[in-house]
């Protein structure tokens, strides 16, 4: 049975990286978590904040990364 994984990738200004991962039985539940992470990542204070939605077979369904550091240097 296919499982759906949501990986949050938090890159800190110190260079440290955290990757909290959640597993779900349904695609709908996984997509809900994925979009919840993205809504927080959009306003995050981290230099880079990303999320990946994938299956346990390694198929990547969606991914998005917010790079706040780059946006701040363009101003």
Task: Please provide the spans of the model-predicted regions.
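Short aromatic-glycine-(Arg/Gly/Cys) micro-motifs in beta-strand/loop hairpins
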Residues: 1-20, 48
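A short, exposed loop/beta-hairpin motif centered on an aromatic-Gly-Thr core
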Residues: 16-32
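Short, mixed-charge low-complexity intrinsically disordered segments
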Residues: 31, 37-75
């Amino acid at each position: 049975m296919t499982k759906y994984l949501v990986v949050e990738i938090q890159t800190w200004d110190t260079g440290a990286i955290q990757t909290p991962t959640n597993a779900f039985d349904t695609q709908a539940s996984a997509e809900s978590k994925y979009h919840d992470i993205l809504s927080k990542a959009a306003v995050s204070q981290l230099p880079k904040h990303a999320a990946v939605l994938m299956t346990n077979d390694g198929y990547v369904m969606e991914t998005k990364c917010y790079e706040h550091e780059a946006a701040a240097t363009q101003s």
